[in-house]
C-alpha cells in the first residue's frame, strides 16, 4: 500500500524473512527508511521525487562481499571486481530506490543491495528486493521524500 493505493509488488524468491542473510533470496521483514534514488540518466530524465537522486554510471556497483569494508555500499567497480552492477542492460535497475536495510550498523552477512527496483516483464521473483512495474515505481517516486518509510511484512 502507498497511502490508500494498493501497488502490486514482486518479492524475493524465498519470501519475507526476519533474519535475512546474504544470498538467501529473501526480502527482509521490517520497517526501513527510504534513503535515495539511483537512476539511469541515459535512458530517462530525472524522475519527479523529493528524494536525493544520483545518476548511475557504468562503473557503479554495490558491494555484496561481507568481508569487504565497502559491504552494502555503492562503489566504483574495476573491470574484474565482483559486485552487483547497477548499470544493467535489462532495465531492472533503471530506477533503484535504496532503503535502510542493514545500514546502521552494517553487519557482515545480514544482506546487502536490498532495493526497490523495476520488475521483470514476467514479474518473476527477485533475489531479495521489492520490484514494481516501471510506471508504478515512477508514480510511487513522486510521493516519496526524506522521512518516508517502507514496511515490509508478510
Walk through the language-model features, giving the residues of each.
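Short cysteine clusters
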Residues: 129
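Cell wall/extracellular polymer interaction/catalysis modules
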Residues: 1-126, 138-154
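A conserved hydrophobic position in a structured secondary element of the catalytic/binding core
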Residues: 132
Amino acid at each position: 500500500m502507498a497511502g490508500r493505493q494498493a501497488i502490486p509488488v514482486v518479492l524475493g524468491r524465498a519470501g519475507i524473512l526476519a533474519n535475512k542473510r546474504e544470498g538467501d533470496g529473501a526480502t527482509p521483514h521490517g520497517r526501513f527508511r527510504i534513503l535515495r534514488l539511483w537512476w539511469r540518466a541515459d535512458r530517462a530524465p530525472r524522475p519527479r521525487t523529493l528524494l536525493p537522486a544520483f545518476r548511475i554510471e557504468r562503473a557503479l556497483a554495490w558491494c555484496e562481499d561481507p568481508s569487504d569494508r565497502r559491504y552494502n555500499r555503492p562503489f566504483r567497480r574495476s573491470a574484474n571486481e565482483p559486485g552487483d552492477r547497477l548499470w544493467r542492460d535489462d532495465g531492472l535497475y533503471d530506477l533503484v530506490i535504496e532503503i535502510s536495510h542493514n545500514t546502521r550498523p552494517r553487519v557482515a552477512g545480514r544482506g546487502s543491495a536490498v532495493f526497490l527496483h523495476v520488475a521483470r516483464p514476467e514479474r518473476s521473483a527477485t533475489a531479495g528486493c521489492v520490484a514494481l512495474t516501471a510506471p508504478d515505481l515512477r508514480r510511487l517516486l513522486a510521493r516519496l521524500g526524506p522521512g518516508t518509510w517502507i514496511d515490509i511484512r508478510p
